[in-house]
């Protein structure tokens, strides 16, 4: 079970994470992570990271939704320590989440968490040089030969 101090309960916290946080989506879930900037009057270093879950009726009936939520909560219990202090994370389940087994759901959650915690400007799988090389190759291949 996720610790009570790590649970997000207030609507304002959900809204903040969803409106101002970094987002990443996978086919079974999406996540939004908001990391507050430390201010002199409100340092976030001692605040624990908090996690909230959103599992809509599109996922399935109540039993299915609750099972998905329990799985996500258990997965986040193991991962909450890797989140920045004072951060707000919202995990939203999509209908595909009900069809995945525990390990597949864990893989998608890990992938989404890596994407939102990665420093800005870093690509997930390709570097800028490889993107430019790919686009140059595509242009060269697609050109018509001159006569």
Curated annotation (Swiss-Prot):
The keyword Hydrolase applies. Its EC number is 3.1.26.5. It holds the Pfam family Ribonuclease_P. The keyword Hydrolase applies. Keywords: Endonuclease, Hydrolase, Nuclease, RNA-binding, tRNA processing. One of its GO terms (molecular function) is 3'-tRNA processing endoribonuclease activity. Belongs to the RnpA family. HAMAP family: RNase_P. RNaseP catalyzes the removal of the 5'-leader sequence from pre-tRNA to produce the mature 5'-terminus. It can also cleave other RNA substrates such as 4.5S RNA. The protein component plays an auxiliary but essential role in vivo by binding to the 5'-leader sequence and broadening the substrate specificity of the ribozyme. This is Ribonuclease P protein component. The lineage of its organism: Bacteria, Bacillati, Actinomycetota, Actinomycetes, Streptosporangiales.
